[in-house]
Amino acid sequence: MKLLILAVAISLAVLASGSYVPSTKFEAKYADKEFLFKQKFFFEVLRNIHLPLKYDEYIPYTKTWVSDETKYNDFAQVAEFFDYYKTGAFLEKGELFSIYNEQYLRQTYAVFTFLYNSADWDTYYKNMIWARDNINEGMFIYVLHLTVMHRPDLQGIVLPAIYEIYPYYFFNTDVIRTINYKKLYDPKFGFYGNGKYNVVYANYTATYPMDYYNNFYTEEYLNYYTEDIGLNACYYYFMMDYSFLLGGDKFGLIKDRRGELYWYMHQMLLARYNLERMSNYMGTVKPLVWRFPLKTGYFSLLSYWNGVPFKSRDYNYMISDESYFKLDWINAWEAKIRKIIEDGFFVKEDGTRINLRLPESVEFFGNLLNSNVDSVDANYVGYIEVFSRLLLSGNDFNAYKVWPSALMQFETSLRDPVFYQLYERFMDLYYYFKRFLPSYTYEELNFNGVVIKDVTFDKLMTYFDYFDSDVSNVLPMQSTDKYFDYAVFARQRRLNHKPFSYTMNVMSDYTGKAIIRAFVGPKFDRFFDLQFYKKYFFEIDQYLVDFTAGKNTFVRNSRDFYWSVKDRTMYTDLYKKIMLGYNGQEKFALDMSEAHCGFPDRLILPKGWTSGMPMQFYFIITPYTAKTYEQGYQYDKTFTCGVESGMRFYDSLPFGYPFDRVINFNYFYTKNMYFKDVFIFHTEEMKMNQRY
């Protein structure tokens, strides 16, 4: 059956996989009933995840999986899952889950292969229903996201935002308790026609009394940023798109340069975090030093669904005597990495040498540290990333049961200030590797005949506004008739910026396609200081342009930026749109308006200062060059992110170019580059983004 109904219209579209571009015109695509049935299914099975399914149409499939081996693509893998599950060793429903546990990781992968290898939608659908009622809830959510993101037949499926599927990982305990309290004492709560009545205000940790929660560390001033639900969801989706469980020819993640992208994602997170620190008059983050007691503690105010709080880490934290062997392993693995960088090569188990003095070897290096499936020898450095998180969480990799901290969940990792210190330490390995690569030559930087004459900006303004999230999933409902007839919202104050545009004037002797890259970073006094400050430049935009001979003027709006995505539609609202489409009452557009694969548009600018924070934008124009991988599957940019396609990025230049290598100032500054001084102003006036 055809998946899509094609209609000519003006639609919301994407310029690239990670961006939401509302101004592009092309042939829009609308979902047919088969597609909308799938959409309806996912929204319903994710409702009230800790309760058994109550939909009559699903209940017959909750008791057993599809056992017919002809219904699977790789039954040998599926049979392994069947045998494994029958042992009774699987994590029980209701227990705390983290992927950073050896047994849970193996079980998660087994469930994934079972569902991924379901040969058709009917088999997948029935097996997913069985898994919904029989697999641990945390594991189920993890596997459902993996299959939806990576099964080719589910391209374009939109899931509810992760912070609305599982609000426990995004909203502090007092919010959850207040909602349940109101529901307990007011049966009409959530059903009133006046939606304002159903709002609960959600505070950040820093707004609570410091002495009560012992949160005296200065990092708490950044809670509005580190606890931002969009930022934390962004990291979750990246770690799921490029899950370390997946790889090889079957998935083709290597086509997206996953190893290099792993480094770059964390570098950009650190750059953006440091810009926010500068906005709050704080110094840049320093690399973690494996010396105990560790000053940086963390007391999360999150709790798991059963009321168990996230495991905390005391200030001046000491590891147990039994954990020092992990520290020895981490230090040994790190020493191995430094040695192969210095040696300039790595010898694989079969004797093949990998030359680490080639720029493309960054791919090998990233996969090695991530210990993912595409690593040529993950055992060489063990699981340095995993064990580092566990050591800082007071947990064991092979424990029978876990009490996870914020570092042990993708959704909450960015909340813990030690995350940034840890990855700054990892990034030091990356910078050390890059030191051995030659600086870019004049020819590699210059674009003959292209001169950026000037760039002008609108006034850059940031502010806090209120945003509502649908957190109805924390309320247990007994009747499916009521599942989507009520809605409860958590209202939170979030950083935002006024949309802005910049205008670039370029003189060109060149005719053809080119790429413009844009970064925002700190203002520095001397040009030579760029060697130090370049790692704090955050890439906000990258786009393809057509040059004609003579003067070219490009106007770019912040809403069109390549790397960013807009806020998501709320769970209940989106479900109602799906049902209107399913019942034939209106068309359901397939576009990137619900994209998960990008940085929150609201956060592309740091907060700045009320008096104006001096910053710089950096631009570079480069010729358009062919991408390394052209043979990935042909994804549709109108409604998918293109993970595994090898077509997500415009060219094959290194991520972060030209700041990714040591700068030779003898010829670095070329005419196709431009630094623009700006000020970012912060206003205390609240801009209300309310639903009602």
Curated annotation (Swiss-Prot):
InterPro entries linked to this entry: Di-copper_centre_dom_sf, Hemocyanin/hexamerin, Hemocyanin/hexamerin_mid_dom, Hemocyanin_C, Hemocyanin_C_sf, Hemocyanin_N, Hemocyanin_N_sf, Ig_E-set
GO cellular component: extracellular region
Compartments reported by the entry: Secreted, Extracellular space
SUPFAM superfamilies (UniProt xref): Di-copper centre-containing domain (SSF48056), E set domains (SSF81296), Hemocyanin, N-terminal domain (SSF48050)
Residues bearing attached sugar chains per UniProt: N203
Residue ranges that the Swiss-Prot or TrEMBL entry lists as coiled coil: none
UniProt entry tagged with the keyword Oxidoreductase: no
Keywords recorded for this protein, A-Z: Glycoprotein, Secreted, Signal, Storage protein
Signal sequence extent: 1-18
GO molecular function, one term: nutrient reservoir activity
Top-level lineage group: Eukaryota
Pfam families on file: Hemocyanin_C, Hemocyanin_M, Hemocyanin_N
Main location group: secreted
Tissues showing expression: Larval fat body.
Keyword Glycoprotein: yes
PANTHER family with a match to the protein in the record: FAT-BODY PROTEIN 1-RELATED, LARVAL STORAGE PROTEIN/PHENOLOXIDASE
Similarity remark: Belongs to the hemocyanin family.
Reported function: Larval storage protein (LSP) which may serve as a store of amino acids for synthesis of adult proteins.
Record text on subunit structure and interactions: Homohexamer.
Descriptive protein name: Hexamerin-1.1
Gene: HexA
